Amino acid sequence: MQLLKQIWNERRSNGWLWSELLIVFVVLWYVVDWTYVTARTYYEPVGFDITDTYYLELSLKNDKSNSYLSKEQKSTSLGQDIIELTNRLRRLPEVEAVSISNNARPYIGSNSGSMLRIDTLVSSPLRRSVTPDFFQVFRYQSADGRGYQPLVQALRNGNVVVGENFWPKDYKGDRTLLGKEMVDVDDSTKVYKIGGVSKKVRYNDFWPNYSDRYVAIELPEKIMVELDDELYPSSVEVCLRVKPGTSRDFAEHLMKLSVNQLSVGNLFILKVHDYEDIRNDFQQESYNQVQVRFWMMGFLLLNIPVSYTHLRAHETR
């Protein structure tokens, strides 16, 4: 009681210390709360798996290359060359699956959108144009627990795939997805049937709900083969998954093969990117932000006993 009376009697002289402690407490509470929410979000399933996966950055030879082919010398389109490249990749003993996509691969930061009507709801999900093997490469999981195979088959049947979280949380109508039809708002002649439903697919490890609704539409080979001058290698995502146990030197091995075995027409592999590196580079800003918050939390935790020591020393005097 004597200590409390002394603190009360000296409340004016100790006011700045108590104010400092209050500010520290408020800021610390904010940082701890932010850290908890961020950590909980980070460890939630992302809906895909990038283990043993690679992205192949493609490019074209220019007329200064000794092996460059002019338009008169070429008998194939760029789309045909890309398909031939993926077929050669599939024949490699280390490769499990290869996919072609556009604005669809994880951690890309580049998107395509669609405006679709399903029942009475108009939604604007991300549009992911992919070949069926995309789901095998990145291990999307069917909402019914049967793995990626139902999603692969859905695209092969000419249907589309959506995530199980396609409906807004406040939607009161029938929340069934499988078998329903969606109409393109901009072109009512385009009608898509939902043939597969995946588990929720997040945009990255740090965003809980942003851009996590999507519709996957098949990118048919018959359309690819017709594309030439209007197609740019940088807009084509060739990704692959290697078999478990494959050497970590696979990217280097692939680049050695690219000179002779994997060069098609003027198309060649410019670089092979390990997907773990893509993930880290894409999220580097978020990692830095987390690091700064941890330093702040450490500083504030250190500041509390220092302020308390100052307060006790002042009370002793």
Which role does the model predict for each range below?
Residues 103-281:
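Mid-to-C-terminal secondary-structure elements
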Residues 34-122:
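Membrane-proximal extracellular/periplasmic loop immediately following the first transmembrane helix
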Residues 7, 89-90, 258-259:
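Hydrophobic C-terminal alpha-helix "anchor/cap" residues
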Residues 12-40, 48:
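Short, strongly hydrophobic transmembrane alpha-helices
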Residues 17-27, 296-308:
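Alpha-helical transmembrane segments of integral membrane proteins
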Residues 1-8:
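A short amphipathic helical element positioned immediately N-terminal to and/or at the very start
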Residues 9-10, 262-300:
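Membrane-helix entry/capping segments
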Residues 310-317:
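Single conserved hydrophobic/aromatic residue that forms the stacking wall/gate
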